[in-house]
Amino acid sequence: MQTADQAGQLAAGFSTYQKWVVGLLTFLQFTIILDFMVLSPLGAMLMPQLGITPAQFGLLVSVYAFSAGASGLLAAGFVDRFDRKRLLLVFYGGFVVGTLMCGLVRTYEFLLFARMITGLFAGVLGSTVFAITTDLFPYQLRGRVMGILQTAFAASSVVGLPLALALSNRWGWNAPFLLIVAVATLVGVAAMRYLRPIDAHLQLRLDRSPLHHFLHTVSMRRYLQGFATSALLATGGFILMPYSSAFLVNNLGIEFGRLPLVYLVTGACSIVAGPLIGRVSDAVGKFLVFCFGSVVTITMVLIYTHLGVTPLGLVILVNSLLFVGVSSRMISASALVSAIPDAADRGSYMSISSSVQQVSGGLAAILGGLIVSETHTGALQHFDVVGYVLVGTTLVTLVMMYFISRRVEGRGASPRSA
């Protein structure tokens, strides 16, 4: 049931400060997502230049995910004991340093180490962003906020990836990481100067040791349900996306120089669709939107992973529809899952959830690397099998999200939890 304050806020929409916070967090998410996503299109360049196999490339993706997962678990016991602004700034600074290392290294081994360092800090950042979002916005507005935050993913495709690919074509694969460092530095300075302290949760924190707080969080049954769902949600992106650029170039016949156009149009569709999906999820129900996204995702994955040499226009259409389906799932799922934890456990829950996603994604990337193999021409084999795995996890998460939706709606997303 809504309180009078909540009803008033829903009628008024976002305050000026809330709009600014959403904008800042979106830019921050943009740098984190771009740092992770940029490896996928660079795969077609990195593998031959560094002389590595798809399995080794999968390890580059996985080491980031595993280190992010480890840091999130280690941080889970104490993240609720600090002002979220300070926590954000400390880990964002470490993320910038790690990304700078990626821009300076020249060998596979050092790049592997740099990705591990970057992941250590990025692992806590994602959960902190969502904890801040949950602290500052009521559940009834959260779909809208998640829809806007999701545009960071799309903006990475529209602006970040084409620009990163252009820089890599001109100055080498290190250049995109230096671009991310430049943008992230500006975002960090803005957050330091203008973001207000976010410490209301400190008034709710129970007097537990970090270990006790961690054990309490991982022992709650409804939290475990959320963790399991988050793990499967992450599997799809990690098992398919890291190998998409190589699949586009070597299987579908798309020239490497045309990849920026594919990501540009696909991302533009996601930018338009993201906020609309968020509004619709708040209006008609988040689980209904999740169902729609799951159906679209399954359909497009089955089409995409079975394509042969394909005209550029059709590739862009299939990719765009696939991203709309994925966005629908992630926006609605993020809003639903954010309502699971109590306010006093929010940072810890989000940190563990993020860690579970990262570890699950890392395992999925390794699995994808083991399933996919290259022919002597560079074409990928068994990519359809990867698609079948993704379809299977999508169906399972659909069932799991149904029960989460019933639990969240049954609790009414009370202020204590939402």
Predicted regions and their residues:
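Helix-breaking motifs and short loop linkers at transmembrane-helix boundaries and internal kinks
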Residues: 51, 83, 104-110, 253, ...
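Extracytoplasmic gate region of multi-pass secondary transporters
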Residues: 39-40, 223-264
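A membrane-interface helix-boundary motif in multi-pass transporters
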Residues: 169-181, 372-392
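Helix-loop-helix hairpin linking two adjacent transmembrane segments in secondary transporters
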Residues: 148-195
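Cytoplasmic helix-loop-helix junction between adjacent transmembrane helices
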Residues: 114-154
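Conserved MFS/SLC helix-loop-helix module at the cytosolic interface between two early adjacent transmembrane helices
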Residues: 70-106
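Juxtamembrane intracellular "pre-TM" segments in multi-pass secondary transporters
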Residues: 5-15, 196-227
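C-terminal transmembrane helical hairpin of 12-TM major facilitator-type secondary transporters
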Residues: 287-333
